[in-house]
């Protein structure tokens, strides 16, 4: 957890889980890295590693002779991923963002790997699991090497709420049960994730102040207003609408 220093719930969950687990009860090996971007964590910086201004999660597989971000990614790619049978990346919305809890699983490079990741995603207490065909980021790079991976998104907006930490720890322990690291059955959860495969990404075409008309997790109808950017005097520059009905 902690590729981005301002995404706190996953960092806190890894800290607490590491202290609470009994090594005698773990079958196999569990490796936890947190917070990976410790410079950004102490500086309370969103997205980037302060020393080089790069998004650590976007420079994989990294470069041992590059900047700090690239060296960190290179070390994880060369020394950590080869040891793992399954990789879980803990995220949340960054300091200036909000989100509804969900999980990404890689849709490539093979259907067998996607099915393995999807089967583990199903034990999480989130409403949605999203099949990603992207190639960027640590978990997608891990998948490209044949390592089944997940990226969980839970909590955020610069907060580190107790309920998000507890939900994260429950998710992680259920993953450990599913993978056989804990010799006990998967615990019941409130949600069974629905598989989402049709994703639309909107990018702003203007520079301005974003005023949203909806909230994370809302269901929207096709044509519904999502939000509008304004200039610094409050003049609406354009309006963005939902291209189809969905979450």
Q: Which stretches of residues belong to each language-model region?
A:
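Structured catalytic-domain cores with a bias toward divalent-metal coordination
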Residues: 1-247
């Amino acid at each position: 957890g902690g590729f981005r220093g301002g995404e706190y719930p996953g960092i806190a969950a890894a800290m607490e889980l590491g202290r609470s687990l009994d090594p005698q009860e773990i079958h196999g090996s569990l490796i936890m890295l947190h917070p990976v971007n410790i410079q950004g964590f102490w500086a309370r910086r969103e997205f980037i590693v302060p020393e080089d201004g790069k998004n650590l999660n976007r420079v994989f597989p990294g470069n041992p002779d590059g900047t700090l971000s690239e060296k960190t990614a290179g070390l994880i790619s060369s020394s950590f991923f080869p040891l793992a049978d399954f990789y879980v990346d803990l995220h949340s919305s960054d300091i200036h963002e909000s989100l509804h809890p969900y999980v990404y699983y890689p849709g490539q490079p093979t259907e067998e790997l996607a099915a393995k990741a999807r089967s583990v995603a199903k034990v999480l207490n989130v409403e949605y699991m999203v099949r990603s065909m992207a190639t960027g980021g640590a978990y997608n790079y891990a998948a490209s090497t044949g390592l089944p991976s997940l990226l969980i998104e839970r909590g955020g907006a610069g907060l580190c709420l107790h309920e998000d930490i507890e939900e994260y720890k429950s998710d992680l322990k259920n993953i450990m049960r599913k993978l056989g690291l804990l010799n006990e059955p998967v615990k019941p959860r409130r949600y069974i994730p629905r598989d989402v495969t049709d994703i639309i990404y909107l990018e702003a075409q203007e520079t301005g102040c974003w005023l949203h008309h909806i909230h994370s997790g809302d269901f929207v109808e096709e044509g519904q207003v999502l939000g509008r950017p304004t200039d610094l005097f409050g003049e609406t520059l354009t309006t963005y609408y939902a291209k189809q009905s969905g979450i």
